[in-house]
Amino acid sequence: MDLIRGVLLRLLLLASSLGPGAVSLRAAIRKPGKVGPPLDIKLGALNCTAFSIQWKMPRHPGSPILGYTVFYSEVGADKSLQEQLHSVPLSRDIPTTEEVIGDLKPGTEYRVSIAAYSQAGKGRLSSPRHVTTLSQDSCLPPAAPQQPHVIVVSDSEVALSWKPGASEGSAPIQYYSVEFIRPDFDKKWTSIHERIQMDSMVIKGLDPDTNYQFAVRAMNSHGPSPRSWPSDIIRTLCPEEAGSGRYGPRYITDMGAGEDDEGFEDDLDLDISFEEVKPLPATKGGNKKFLVESKKMSISNPKTISRLIPPTSASLPVTTVAPQPIPIQRKGKNGVAIMSRLFDMPCDETLCSADSFCVNDYTWGGSRCQCTLGKGGESCSEDIVIQYPQFFGHSYVTFEPLKNSYQAFQITLEFRAEAEDGLLLYCGENEHGRGDFMSLAIIRRSLQFRFNCGTGVAIIVSETKIKLGGWHTVMLYRDGLNGLLQLNNGTPVTGQSQGQYSKITFRTPLYLGGAPSAYWLVRATGTNRGFQGCVQSLAVNGRRIDMRPWPLGKALSGADVGECSSGICDEASCIHGGTCTAIKADSYICLCPLGFKGRHCEDAFTLTIPQFRESLRSYAATPWPLEPQHYLSFMEFEITFRPDSGDGVLLYSYDTGSKDFLSINLAGGHVEFRFDCGSGTGVLRSEDPLTLGNWHELRVSRTAKNGILQVDKQKIVEGMAEGGFTQIKCNTDIFIGGVPNYDDVKKNSGVLKPFSGSIQKIILNDRTIHVKHDFTSGVNVENAAHPCVRAPCAHGGSCRPRKEGYDCDCPLGFEGLHCQKECGNYCLNTIIEAIEIPQFIGRSYLTYDNPDILKRVSGSRSNVFMRFKTTAKDGLLLWRGDSPMRPNSDFISLGLRDGALVFSYNLGSGVASIMVNGSFNDGRWHRVKAVRDGQSGKITVDDYGARTGKSPGMMRQLNINGALYVGGMKEIALHTNRQYMRGLVGCISHFTLSTDYHISLVEDAVDGKNINTCGAK
């Protein structure tokens, strides 16, 4: 060893004597050392499956660093699990390196070290550090969105809307993605590879006359949701039915590079574009109005995607001009400005603010910035809730093209005009009036209905002129070459188009109030001006069109549209908690809470028999009596009602987080029972229509996914819901006669409009829903014209409606048709003598709560003796049980079933039922004795032999907390679990407990109802 050291020392001395050129020699003989560990190491959990690690380069590495290796392993894991490593190449330009380690287990602690490596090999490991990934609960993706709603716009376009799912997961939703499938051709879903920021869109470029289904996914920072429930299958129109007319403003687009193809399940060679819809903040509850913004995307080349360049907001001078000869700024009733925004430059040089778009104005020259549908104000920044659209001469609203109308159509329009000229309606083969079209215009205060089947125009002019500022109704009808115009139900005017062609091709949208190309339509329609005024209603081919913006209504787009009813409630004075709402363009009603009525809710009243009116938007609400789990698999409703209209909702409830619902509706005079367990809707419809103005009884029941409907004495209708789910959960109230918001109802519920008529009885699972006590909210519910409203029952008696008649339920001590007789005119202290033998009428009862009585009908032994007579086969003689009754609750009962006497009891481990067969409803007096000793029971009737029985299980005591009832009880079916449906019809003369405890039936009773005096002993 000393020899080696000496040699090395000599070599070093030699190298130093050789000068700088010997440095390489010194390096060659130096022994290389390990690279030190990286510095400033930082760890952090990113989500439930990844963490980040950051470090800096080691100081004074002995040799150049080539890269790094991250070593990580689970803390406390099985030693058989190998340590994992992750290599990171060196980035020379960045002193600090950061890396993400993924594909980890949620909520798991990891031990992490890092080492640099060089030509000399692996460097020294850093000290181990620990990091724990986030728990699974904090990294949840969103729930699947609700089933999308699809409207077919044309032969190549559809409009989609959807609502978010029950949960957005552990992070806000970032965007949505849309997928589609053609069921007749495709086996896989095709993804539209674009991030949709809104909850509505329009897809273009689809195949004509083809079936499609659509689904939606939501994405947050933790991943995508499951695919939504697919939409219903829709079919695009045939080219002959409708075209793909442009119905939205044009936008500047820029062809840019798209994102990569990840996420595509199938790529078809389709050229599909879509239009994303922008929400308007004024709409609450997730239902959003929109404007259409064009984008294009070629699915055959997903990397090439059209991107929208949003309009630039700028402070530009606005020219306000007068109608003659210059246009001016106009305002709606609420003062929201509908600006002309006219500029003396073409659209190529004009910048419009957000929520507006530019059109060239050929009438005045220059260009105009128009607000999109649902926006107004000087910069189009104010929200306008549109229900009754208001037009200003350059406005318009678009709807889908006329469908199934090429041979015949009928259109009804109610409007109020403020100018002598203007275009009301237009739909045609193209935007410029060449070829096929139909139009309705006001020309010098006359209405002109024009249509062209391709070979000549028909012009039909109203015989009378309209009155400016007044409301008018016009009906247009065409069948082939022949047309008809009727104004205000006056004498129809007819006309005929020229030539032989009798069909019209409609490709453009249906324009209301004007058109974007109105200037070029003058030769076809007779005017180049837009309509000025309000439209209150529009119906096409018998179907009323909801003029609100899609997806709430059917309006697809529009420009510079106001709201006619705006400000109408500013001067309204609804009191007692009432709220104002517009019901027409120029009128309002107060939505009065329960117990108040009148134009301004000024009249207080007591609700007895509810009357609902569609015109007043009536409804009432009551909570479910029990928790939702009590109704998951079975529910039954009995309703007695009198309809004044053949359409409307009787009852509705639903679940906000799923597809579950149930509804009872009138549709075309028939009763419909609809329900959905979450996998498909069942629809049961009565065979015969109802007679309006008459009282009817209906019963609906659902067991799992099977339903039953019976109306009056009609044939019972049975049906089944689709799919495999069998339970319904409803977390909303039960809505009766209407609902607060018809936009929130389930799509297949059939709930379209309020009920008009009266409802006098609602029973749910044998439990009566009382109007006075159970209705918790509602609006504009008044009293029906019924005798019970006048409170005809005296002395505290309650009126029980029986269709158009009634019965009085009299308190103990009173009798008569109206409870007007007091103990048969005896004094109060002689009630006992007057009603020594009480008579029961099937809805009577006597109640006892004296502890000396109750202890004899409980415990280990019971002995009951009773003398009775009856003419009814069924009826309850005696009952004591828990209140409320639960499964396997203790009870003891005595009664008649189909003429036989039945003694039943349950000690908590099963029911004993001991029967004596016979016909004891013969109107004669009978003696019955029922004895229980522990589990054993015996019943004896008259001189018949005794019948015995024994309850199952081990329980021997009768433990009851309820009162004792004789002859019947309140809500008998509910409280006896349907063992008995009515009380005794007859008399009871003797009642003895424990062989020697005689009870005075009336004197000892604490309460009773409908007790009369029995005629003979």
Swiss-Prot record:
It is found in: Secreted, Extracellular space, Extracellular matrix; Synaptic cleft; Presynaptic active zone. Residues 1-24 form the signal peptide. Residues 386-564, 609-788, 835-1014 form the Laminin G-like domain. Keywords: Cell projection, Disulfide bond, EGF-like domain, Extracellular matrix, Glycoprotein, Heparan sulfate, Proteoglycan, Repeat, Secreted, Signal, Synapse. O-glycosylated; contains chondroitin sulfate and heparan sulfate. Residues 343-381, 565-602, 784-820 form the EGF-like domain. One of its GO terms (cellular component) is photoreceptor ribbon synapse. GO terms for biological process: extracellular matrix organization; positive regulation of cell-substrate adhesion. Transmembrane segments: none annotated. Involved in both the retinal photoreceptor ribbon synapse formation and physiological functions of visual perception. Plays a key role in the synaptic organization of photoreceptors by mediating transsynaptic interaction between alpha-dystroglycan and GPR179 on the postsynaptic membrane. Necessary for proper bipolar dendritic tip apposition to the photoreceptor ribbon synapse. Promotes matrix assembly and cell adhesiveness. This is Pikachurin. It comes from Homo sapiens. The gene is EGFLAM.
